[in-house]
Amino acid sequence: MRPAPLLLVLLLAWAALGGVVLAGALPRWSWALVATVIGTLALLDLWRQARRPSPQVQRELPEALALGVRREVGLRLQTTEPMRVQVFDLVPGGWPLESLPQRVQLRPGHACALHYTLQPQQRGRFRFEGVQLRIRSPWRLWWQQRTLPPLLDVRVYPNFVPLTRFALFSADQASRLVGAHVKRRRGEGTDFHQMREYRVGDSLRQLDWKATARARKLISREYQDEKNQQLLLMLDSGRRMLASEGGLSHFDHALNASLVVAYLALRQGDAAGLFAVGGERRWVQPQRGMGTVEHLLRASYDLQPQPVATDYLAAATEVSLRQRRRALVMLVSNVRDEDIEDLLAAVRLLQRRHLVCVASLREHELDGALEGEVHTLEDAAQAGAAALYLQQRTKAHEALRSEKVMVLDVTADALPAALVERYLAVKREGLL
């Protein structure tokens, strides 16, 4: 319970009255009388406030939120007595808020609805500990703070908003939405789809001469990309993925991009799975069907990168034991020169059965360090260190390419498009 401004004003007026009494303008008993009146009013108001029932509060918010996506939250308050309150929701994790706190006047029989926006900053499970109200007493002499239910547990998932947007488009259109450059091939692929009349632009090898002779017109065979192939996304959750760009860790960027390419693979009729390595390990067996997206989200929403070294060879061994069918294995990490021997041994093991692609995330700061002007000795030292690091990084990538590994050297924001392009290229070329 805290004094309200009105009580403070009354106390200041009482103190000023004391100066008048000391000057002899008023009798001493008048000062004591005013003190008694103010004290009695304050105590009565305090007693009345303590007996007032708390408002009823309801929170309108889904239990699933997306990382980094602003969400509107609704609060609904009802009371049996008129009262003035200040409302603040106890949001977890120190997430950024807009439009809180708010002051509202509650009236009996009328529900008061207010809204604010929040932006989750971390994946995982979190709890809203309640709604905090500062309630003004009936005579406006006190502010009382009360914490009321409802408690609410929420899950913050990787950013699934692009996936809901992709559902409105075909696989090719969704690929273009993430920036992937799709090469269209009409009627070509590895699986027979149908017979149809010849169209301008069809290749001669598509012509079916027996069907043409029977129909007495040109008939083409139409093929499509093979379906029911396997995609396994290996995500490094070790120390290499702790770097942060754009408010998200490299691991978050990798996870978001992996969900995008997995979604598109499922739309193409393929099976998609996930394997987190480095920190806490999670395995989702490649499965077909759009319901797999929910499995991937639930398996990965609380994964966090850990400050530990990633054992690539142990991870590759586990993949070899678990994933018996040939698959496109996409490893997303931040490849360093000191990791290359272990990584080379891992990809050699994987290549005995699988097609391997390594996506190596590159920090934006490295590009800026080389492009910036050099004016001081410190600038020169930073540029030299960045150049040496990039040289070692390129050397590591070349070592992987020498083993016939597909290597993607990309920044975090370009990762979704790069993964989608590579996946579609593998499908187009029939490499699986």
Where are these regions (language model features)?
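C-terminal signal-anchor/stop-transfer transmembrane helix together with its immediate cytosolic
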Residues: 2-7, 31, 339, 423-432
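Von Willebrand factor
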Residues: 292-328
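Active-site glycine- and acidic-residue-rich loops that bind
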Residues: 335-341
